[in-house]
Structure formats: C-alpha cells, structure tokens
C-alpha cells in the first residue's frame, strides 16, 4: 500500500512524520487532513505532537517497533504526551546529543541502525539499548546525514541517486536488505525527507512521480495488496497480543 500526500503544502513528508511497525508520530498541524488520512489508513497508534514546539517531528526523532529516541530539547509535557499515546512496550527516551536533529543523523529498522559518525558514544549506546539494534557508523556515499539521504524498512533501503554501486553493495551486505538508489518528489535527492515506510505501507510526498513510486514500492517490497494486508494483520496482531 502506497500513498502520496502533502503536509500543509509541503511534500517533505519525512520531515513531519515518523512511521514504524508499531506507531506513527506526526507533527501538529492547523488542519486535520493528514491526521484524518492516517486514522483512516494506518492501523497503529498515531500521536500528533510537537518537539520543542517544532512541527517537523520527523527530523527531530527516530524510532522503531521497540523504542523512540527524542532530543533533549523536548519539553516534559511533550514527552509525557508521546509516552501516554504510544504502546506501553515502546520505550521513549531523551538523548543528550549535540546533533539533536535525530531523524537526520540516525536511520534504522527493527534490527539495525546506521548513524552519523560524529554522534557521541553515549548516544550510540542508547540507540543500541533503546531500539534493540546493531549500530554502525556509516555514511550513505559521501553523506553523513543518513536519515536525510536514506529511507529504510525491514525489506529494503532507498538511497540518494549519487550513491555508487559499490556503496549500495556495501550497505546491502551490512544491513542484509536490498538497496536501490532513487529520487523522491520529482527528482529530490533527499529521499529520507520525502518518504516514510514500514513493512506494509509507504507515504511519499505528493510531488513523487509514478516512476519514483514504482522504485519505492519495489525496494520496500510493497507490491501485492493481499500479501501486504496479511503482513499488516500479522504485525498488528502481534502488537495487540
């Protein structure tokens, strides 16, 4: 299942949203259009919030089915709201990190994470413990902002178009997923800013072309509605139990 939307006129969906197999975090908006769309199409808990009064929560946080990492700039009220809105077994943790746009410097699925090389060792340890993943300091090509220039689920990884074949192969072997280079929103290199995905759906910016969407659906293994519905039910049922 794949969709193309905008967030109050912006196609940078990844900047305003974080989507995992167990929850979705979305920036607070003036209209209810995006929230209503998510409530109708995403069968997991949704939390609408700000982080440090900023709506671009996708750039500020990073998580998976096990946990959610938020920057130290988040207010007590905001983190309490997030904790109360997510499943009880999802650990929400602040990180005291200089590079506090966590969504831009961390990229993960439910098993592995790659991070900006300049993150603190303490941050690396928290990422490993909270998200329950193996952690590697790894660029995407020449780009250290892995969350900006890559998008990842448990089946595949989309990377920016100037990622060499050698780097794609290296990432594929490291992450044990298929890795494909592509663009988003009609040619943008910032693929992480333009699409979010879990294991049964993806949401891309409204400017994304049909060709770009076909590449995205292929790398994330999101073709075949019946198979995706069965996958969604299996994952959601496991969460409920």
UniProtKB/Swiss-Prot annotation:
Principal cellular location given in the protein's record: cytoplasm
Pfam families per the UniProt record, alphabetical: eIF-6
Keyword Protein biosynthesis attached: yes
Keyword Cytoplasm among UniProt keywords: yes
Keyword field: Cytoplasm, Initiation factor, Nucleus, Protein biosynthesis, Ribosome biogenesis
A GO CC term assigned to this protein in UniProt: cytoplasm
Organism superkingdom: Eukaryota
GO biological process, one term: ribosomal subunit export from nucleus
InterPro entries the UniProt entry points to: eIF6
Localization, UniProt: Cytoplasm; Nucleus, Nucleolus
Molecular function, one GO term: translation initiation factor activity
Quaternary state and interactors: Monomer. Associates with the 60S ribosomal subunit.
NCBIfam families named among the record's database cross-references: eIF-6
UniProt record similarity statement: Belongs to the eIF-6 family.
Function: Binds to the 60S ribosomal subunit and prevents its association with the 40S ribosomal subunit to form the 80S initiation complex in the cytoplasm. Is also involved in ribosome biogenesis. Associates with pre-60S subunits in the nucleus and is involved in its nuclear export.
Protein name: Eukaryotic translation initiation factor 6
Organism: Encephalitozoon cuniculi (strain GB-M1)
Taxonomic lineage of the native organism: Eukaryota, Fungi, Fungi incertae sedis, Microsporidia, Unikaryonidae
Gene this chain is encoded by: TIF6
């Amino acid at each position: 299942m794949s969709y193309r939307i905008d967030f109050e006129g912006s196609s940078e969906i990844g900047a305003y949203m974080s989507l995992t197999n167990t929850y979705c975090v979305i920036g607070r908006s003036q209209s209810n259009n995006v929230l209503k769309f998510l409530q109708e199409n995403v069968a997991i808990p949704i939390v609408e919030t700000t982080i440090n009064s900023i709506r671009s929560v996708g750039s500020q946080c990073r998580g998976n089915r096990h946990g959610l990492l938020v920057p130290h700039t988040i207010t007590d009220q905001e983190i309490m709201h997030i904790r109360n809105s997510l499943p009880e077994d999802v650990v929400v943790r602040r990180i005291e990190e200089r590079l506090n746009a966590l969504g831009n410097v961390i990229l993960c699925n439910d098993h592995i994470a790659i991070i900006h090389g300049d993150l603190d060792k303490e941050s690396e340890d928290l990422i490993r413990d909270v998200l329950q993943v193996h952690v590697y300091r790894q660029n995407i090509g020449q780009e250290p902002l892995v969350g900006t220039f890559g998008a990842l689920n448990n089946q595949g990884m989309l990377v920016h178009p100037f990622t060499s074949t050698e780097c794609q192969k290296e990432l594929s072997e490291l992450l044990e997923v298929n890795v494909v280079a592509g663009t988003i929103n009609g040619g943008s290199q910032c693929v992480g800013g333009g699409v979010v995905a879990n294991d049964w759906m993806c949401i891309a910016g409204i400017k994304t072309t049909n060709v770009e969407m076909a590449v995205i659906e292929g790398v994330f293994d999101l073709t075949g509605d019946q198979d995706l519905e069965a996958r969604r039910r299996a994952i959601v049922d496991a969460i409920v139990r």
